[in-house]
Structures are given as C-alpha cells and as structure tokens.
Amino acid sequence: AIVYLDEIVEARKDTTVIIHPLSDDRRLLPIEKKGQVIEAVDDFMLVISYNPGYQSILKDLKQSTKQRFMAIEFDYPLPDVESRVVAHEAGVSLEVAQRLVKIAEKVRNLKNHGLEEGVSTRLLIYAATLIRQGVPADQACDVAIARPITDDPDMLRSIIEVVKAIF
C-alpha cells in the first residue's frame, strides 16, 4: 500500500505531526477521536511531495518531519523530453511545443532576478492547449505563462518580448 500526500507544506502544521508515528519505526497511525490505532502493513509506504521553490519561511516542513523521509530532488525535464510531454499532453505539434519550451528556458533564467519562480511544464501545457484551440500564440503565452507567474509590469513586458522573439 502507498499513501501519497501531495503539497504537504499546504497542510496545517498541527496536522503534519500526525504522520510522525506512521513515518518512523512505530509504523502506527493513532486516531485519537476514535480511540483507534492503525498499524501499517509490512509493504506500506508513505510518500510526500512539495515544491521547495514555492515555499516561504511560513510554509516549510518542520525538521522533525523532513528527517523521517528520504529526499529526491527533481528539476525541469530536459528540453527534448519536456517538448514531447507538452506536445503529447496538449495535442500540438512538436514544433509548437519546442517553441514554448524555449520560452520557458529563457524565462526560467529570470528566476531570482525579478521572478520568484520559473515557468512550470503545466503552464506550457495550458498555453499549448490554448494555441491548439485557435488562440494566437502571443495571447496564449500572455494569459497562460506570463500573467500567472508575475504581476510586475516590467517583467510582463520582458516575458512578452521573449514570446515575440520566439513566435
């Protein structure tokens, strides 16, 4: 059995400590309101995920929780892989997907230089889907890539310039 808790940092701090006895050698989940204790089966795995780049000082895992898990770090997929993912998921040509990934690469370079976070593959798929539905590429990139990641007018202009250069 596998339990997957996505975006664990979004959970209230007082709720994440509930998994402590489940995630250590006790392998138990106490349910206080019912007076029950559930014991994990031998092949039980608890998997949590979160995006460290989206955290603030207020949204981080407690050290006592972090230390109960192995950590694996993922970066964006390689451009050729990401292009194939975008093309497949959005139903656009590989050429359109490659252009969107090129935009993402350029915009991701602005992270920590005015942008808090880069362009996710999800946003590329949203933009590609709009393009497939007939929305002009510049407009699709504006509403699905640029505006979701920044409100800063100068940064928006910069991203739109990147879009114009590639599309």
Sequence positions of predicted segments:
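C-terminal regulatory/interaction module of P-loop NTP-utilizing enzymes
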Residues: 1-167
